């Protein structure tokens, strides 16, 4: 049995209630649930939450909420991996040694069923612990700058001041959408950003962090443009 687990706590600060806030016609979490259900590569979609309203919305969209996440895993400091580990442990009776787990973020309206299928296929064929979505940086990270305490500019890597962009290695970052992993990898809390993982590459125009009101507005505009 393959399971998609969507972590969705109720205490978001910068965008209050963002997991159930309406995004282009439906609660944000609804987009992730629907993509997982339509993918035909998971047998169930489980939402891990501490919040009754999120649980109610999740059930409405066809997900299961078989447990309430404990408060110790719902604060501002707990990472995703222990949350997924807890969910896997709670679902032990439904899983077997071949079960594969997809951590799917609640704030991933750009994720598609095809993306999830690609991730599962790569996990099965690559022998990796994890497979997750990535995209490329729009600008060479080797030419990044910082603003110091005196409001002056410094290069992070000054040795690349005169290096042409096309001569710099392309860099990638986590797309923040989904993370397929083996049951053992999640239970063992293995390192996701390491040599045990493989990527599913997404185009930059389908990747958007949604952490601030400005992010939210940009995501809505982009989403509507892609739907038109």
Where are these regions (language model features)?
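Short phosphate-binding loop-to-helix
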Residues: 53-101, 111-114, 118
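Short, high-confidence coil segments that cap the C-terminus of an alpha-helix
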Residues: 42, 96-98, 127-128
